[in-house]
Amino acid sequence: MRVGLIVDSACDLPYEFSRKHDLFILPVTAVIDGQTYIDEHDPVRTQEFYQSGLLQKGHHAETQAFTEDQIHDLFMEKIVTQFDVAICETVTRSRSLIFENATKAMNSVLANYEKARAAAGRDGKFSMRVIDSKQIFAGQGLLAAHTLKLIGQKLPKNALRHEVEAFTDKIYTCVIPRDLHYIRERARRRGDKSISAVVAFLGKALNITPVIFGQGAEGQPVAKTRNFDVAVEKVMNYAAARVDAGLLTPYVSLSCGLTWTEIE
């Protein structure tokens, strides 16, 4: 039984890790200043994209989920023909239509996969599950890494699905935003009003960098620091302490909106 894992391009994992484990990336459409781009998680194109300055302030950027039909076609062409069981983990459904569209596409695929599978020379039935990761970015990457570990243990498909779904409620995330005002404006376009104008203004005026902590994609400020480096040190110390205490999976997932020079 060959099991495949599908994640969308919002999932933050190292490119080489994704290639090594044969992850299938479900693309996301980015619309920037009226121009459409397809994010397929290619590291070279992503680097060029950031260096172009299109994601800097002053540009209007939004992401759009692939449609049900687009996802259906990808599943039929790339998944049904290669795997016997597939798990698709999406960014949290509260922030995107990917989960909804992928679920509809899955239902259509499961009702019509026989011809495509036979043409590819694969015997037996095909089964699939779309799972709401309840995460964004690094949290989604952690779930994917843990899922690959479970796949490696060759669990029965029902047990695999149960373990993955149970793990989605056990992921905690720390976020260090550099610019609360910018994050507030981006969030407001999605209808998220969790960051008030006063908080964003004070954060910028007083050079306060908060640490946001929470389960999944939901979080609250738990610390306020006077600069970014102090916030990073606090989070790294906390992460190291949790590793020492023992984790449910042998992975920690880290996403950085930094250049390699800044990271080094």
Predicted regions, residues:
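N-terminal glycine-rich anion-binding loop in soluble enzyme alpha/beta folds
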Residues: 4-77
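Short, conserved catalytic or adaptor-binding loops enriched in Gly and charged residues
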Residues: 17, 116-124
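Hydrophobic residues at beta-strand termini and immediately following loops
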Residues: 26-28, 89, 131
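Short, charged beta->alpha transition segments
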Residues: 68-80, 115-118, 239-240
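Mixed-charge interfacial surface used for oligomerization/domain docking
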Residues: 14, 18, 23-24, 96, ...
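Short Gly/Thr/Asp-enriched flexible loops that form oxyanion-binding sites at enzyme active sites
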Residues: 90-118
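Anionic group-transfer/hydrolysis microenvironments
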Residues: 10, 92, 134
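Structural motif
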Residues: 4, 85-87
